[in-house]
A protein has these predicted regions:
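Sec-dependent N-terminal signal peptides
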Residues: 4-12
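Acidic/histidine-rich catalytic neighborhood of metal-dependent amide-processing enzymes
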Residues: 133-208, 266-276, 428
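Alpha-helical metal-binding/catalytic segments enriched in His/Glu/Asp
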Residues: 100, 121-171, 211-217, 226-251, ...
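Metal-dependent amide/peptide-bond hydrolase catalytic core
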Residues: 17-23, 47-48, 195-196, 205, ...
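Extracytoplasmic/secreted envelope proteins and their assembly/folding machinery
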Residues: 36-40, 59, 63, 141, ...
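Positively charged n-region of N-terminal signal peptides that target proteins for export
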Residues: 1-4, 155-156
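Short, flexible, mixed-charge acidic loops at enzyme active sites
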Residues: 109-120, 206-211, 274-279
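Acidic/His- and Gly-rich active-site-bordering loop/insert found
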Residues: 19-129, 148-154
């Protein structure tokens, strides 16, 4: 057993024995303190999606870093899609085109009480966007800095896009994601640096897409003592309940599919604010509800599953409506899915090999059910090999307890840097 362990350690050591790879690892270690400082600076700038000045400020901070690395940087103004904009950094070179994806914004707007980077201990820090995803942005920069210091970056063909509206995409969405889609043109590989499942033993090779739906119901009002009469009917609320339960009966349990009616209102009069996802309803106990509405989301792993779910929901609405009611169901597209592909699996295998060679252990694909929506999904039809969730790890993102595991900053950076180097040199 001991002999096998010694042999294993020898193999791990020898697998990164090539001088360029050793130099990359050493350079990442040397730059870790600077990376931590950059992370703290970025987190201390509020960049809630709707704080345009803050998003631009984080973009300026990172832009200087890319400029110093020899990238040609561009700020894409977001006025056309009602957002701050995006940072694009391009480094033409030889070898395969590789796209790296990050985002500058967070869910924490200026009115949030959660505003500052706080070091908890040597291993952990808390702060708004520290893992989602300023930590991932810093992993990108630290990996490129390590490659530059080791003399390996100059020949690389890399483009980086850091969007300014990942947490709340601009409108129209097509315009908001055009810079990302354009950057993906000709790319053979793409890496997204979201925090993923928060566990460095996993990365993302598939993501479910998101869309929204709205069910609006009209009924015949009248005195409650007359409800269920054929000429009065059941009212809007009963029809809303019938349809929602039909969705549950027909679709619940289908693999990778979820649907959630998140906001329900019913009564004599409704006031719905769809932007802020809230509203008011008024009615009396002795009056039959005339109007009802339900708003929710739908998550699917493929275009085919999305269409199947929508068709099923439409059929439920159309079948046997309750007397004197009518319902209307509408859909709105959101983030597309990132389906699992052979190319994604092969890229993960290379990332896994780099991790093992560094002594960090294996990396497996996380279930798409545990992976939310992200920007890489918009390029799933263009780039054959995509992985995501390889940024800084931690827990409680999108909450005032968002916490980073700082011990994963150098390890995630080394994994990314070694993978980029090997992809450029040719898969081992």
């Amino acid at each position: 057993m001991l002999r096998r362990l010694i042999l294993l350690l020898f193999v791990v050591q020898m697998s990164i024995s090539a001088p360029p790879e050793r130099a990359i690892v050493s350079a990442v270690d040397a730059g870790n303190a600077r990376a931590l400082s950059l992370l703290e600076q970025a987190v201390n700038i509020n960049s809630g999606t709707h704080n345009f000045a803050g998003v631009r400020a984080v973009g300026d901070l990172f832009r200087k870093e890319f400029d110093a690395l020899g990238f040609k940087t561009t700020w894409v103004d977001g006025a056309a899609f009602k957002r701050a904009g995006h940072l694009v950094a391009d480094h033409p070179g030889r070898g395969p085109r590789i796209l790296l994806v990050g985002h500058l914004d967070t869910v924490f707007e200026p009115d949030s009480p959660f505003q500052k980077f706080e070091r908890i201990d040597d291993r952990t820090a808390r702060g708004p966007g520290v893992i989602d995803m300023k930590g991932g942005d810093v992993v990108i920069l630290a990996a490129l800095e390590g490659l530059k210091s080791a003399g390996a970056l100059d020949a690389m063909n890399i483009v980086v896009v850091m969007t300014g509206d990942e947490e709340d995409a601009g409108d129209p969405q097509e315009a908001a994601r055009k810079p990302l889609v354009d950057a993906a043109e000709g790319a053979q590989y793409a890496l997204g640096f979201e925090d993923g499942p928060g566990d460095p033993r996993y990365a993302v090779t598939a993501r479910r897409g998101t869309s929204s739906w709205k069910l609006q119901v009209k009924g015949k009002t009248g005195h409650s003592s007359q409800i269920f009469r054929p000429d009065i009917g059941y009212g809007a609320n009963y029809e809303l309940a019938r349809v929602l339960d039909g969705f549950r009966r027909k679709l619940a349990g289908e693999p990778h599919l979820t649907f959630n009616p998140s906001l329900l209102l019913g009564g004599s009069a409704l006031d719905v604010d769809e932007v802020l996802s809230r509203g008011n309803a008024s009615g009396k106990t002795n009056v039959i509800a005339e109007r009802a509405v339900a708003i929710g989301d739908l998550r699917t792993l493929s275009k085919e599953q999305l269409q199947h779910a929508r068709d099923t929901m439409k059929a439920v609405v159309a079948e046997a409506p309750l007397a004197q009611t009518e319902a209307t169901l509408t859909f709105e597209d959101g983030y597309p899915s990132l389906p699992p592909t052979d190319g994604n699996a092969k890229l993960l295998a290379e990332y896994d090999r780099a991790s093992r060679d560094l002594g960090f252990g294996p990396v497996a694909a996380v279930s798409p059910d545990r992976a939310g929506a992200a920007d890489v999904s918009f390029i799933s039809g263009q780039v054959k090999s995509i992985i995501d969730g390889v940024g800084l790890m931690g827990h409680d993102d999108h909450s005032p307890g968002e916490t980073a595991d700082l011990s994963t900053l150098p390890s995630q950076t080394k994994r990314a840097a070694l993978l980029l180097y090997r992809l450029t040199q040719g898969t081992r």
